[in-house]
Amino acid sequence: MGGFLVLNSSNNVVRTVPSKKRKHPEYKSKIRELISGIRSDNLREAVRLPQGVDINEWFAMNTVDFFNQISLLYATLEEFCTQTTCPVMNAGRYEYRWADGTTITKPKTVSAPKYVEYLIDWVETEIDNEAIFPKNPGEPFPPNFEDFVKRILRKLFRVYAHIYYSHFHEIVALNEQAHLNTCFKHFLLFVSEFQLVDKEKEMAPIKSLVETMLDQ
């Protein structure tokens, strides 16, 4: 998925579906392009529901946007996050097992790169499903759309937790920490604004970082 999400002049949501090709030499410039429109001093205002915009549309466009961001950020770490270096998807003592409720119903232990591979394929399938993410303006969202969004965002948070816990030194070496921090703060403010990720249960592995970012 490589698109960007905006409100046009009529305050209608423009949603784009990303490309499945994540490995590309321009990923760093793509990250900078993605981040360029996000100013750290206006993130709290940026996550609020704009007047006249349907909340499900707002959830949909931001979910796709956050997925784009974490996909690009993780792409910078693929040479460091391997089956050997990260045989279990975790954030410290917290292990994240994979299940999608459809093809894999029983949570299973997987490596971090395998977890992210499963996640990307699963999210793309969800977003491509027009019964969940309708593509045309005015088409109704399913009554339980917020539940789909919560599931996606909860799993995206786990990738952030793994990156911060296991790969922050590589992020610093790549000089990408400002981009990572801006994306993560944007994500945190959004999920906190609409209570989409359980702070006590899901955010415990990096609780102090979460609290610091939300207090800034």
UniProtKB/Swiss-Prot annotation:
SMART domains in UniProt: Mob1_phocein (SM01388)
Family (UniProt): Belongs to the MOB1/phocein family.
One Gene Ontology MF term: metal ion binding
Keyword entries, A-Z: Metal-binding, Nucleus, Zinc
Protein name (database record): MOB kinase activator-like 2A
Pfam families assigned to the protein according to its UniProt record, in alphabetical order: Mob1_phocein
Annotated source species: Arabidopsis thaliana
Compartments, record wording: Nucleus
PANTHER family listed in its UniProt record: MPS ONE BINDER KINASE ACTIVATOR-LIKE MOB (PTHR22599)
An example Gene Ontology CC term for this record: nucleus
Keyword Metal-binding on entry: yes
Entry keyword annotation includes NAD: no
Gene3D superfamilies the UniProt entry points to: MOB kinase activator (1.20.140.30)
Positions bound to Zn(2+): 81, 86, 162, 167
